[in-house]
Each structure stands twice: as structure tokens, then as C-alpha cells.
From Swiss-Prot:
InterPro entries: LtuA. This is Late transcription unit A protein. It holds the Pfam family LtuA. It comes from the Bacteria. It comes from Chlamydia pneumoniae.
Amino acid sequence: MFFIAVRSRGFLDIHGILAARKGKQVVKSTAGAWIGSRGAVFYSLVS
């Protein structure tokens, strides 16, 4: 019984970690796209 509880808790933790990593990747890609679009606009204005 204890083993099952530990296993299920570890399973949930793994999914929590994966969800957090996925969230960070989404934030990074969104920030990168935002910075990239701003840079393109700035570059076209300067040139």
C-alpha cells in the first residue's frame, strides 16, 4: 500500500515537473517571438 502511494505521488510529481517545463518553454518562445517582432519593426524603421 505504501509503495503504491509513493509510486502515484512520484507519478504526479513527474507530471508536475513536465508541466512546469512545458510552461517555461511556452513563456520563452512567446518572449522570443515578441522580442523578434519588435526587433524587426525597429530594424525596418532604422533602415
